[in-house]
Amino acid sequence: MKKMMKNMEMKNMEMKNMNNFNGNSIKITNEGIYCGLFQISDHVPFVDTLA
């Protein structure tokens, strides 16, 4: 479980970088992370690994 949480933190960093890259202003929070993932899933290949 801890490893998964660490993984999520890494993904969050990647998500923030992607946000800057594609110009989207998706706010990544614990509550909104899945919503954010689905919104830009077209641009993010690792979304399937979190599902």
From Swiss-Prot:
Please state what the protein is called: Uncharacterized protein 375R
Classification of source organism:
Viruses, Varidnaviria, Bamfordvirae, Nucleocytoviricota, Megaviricetes
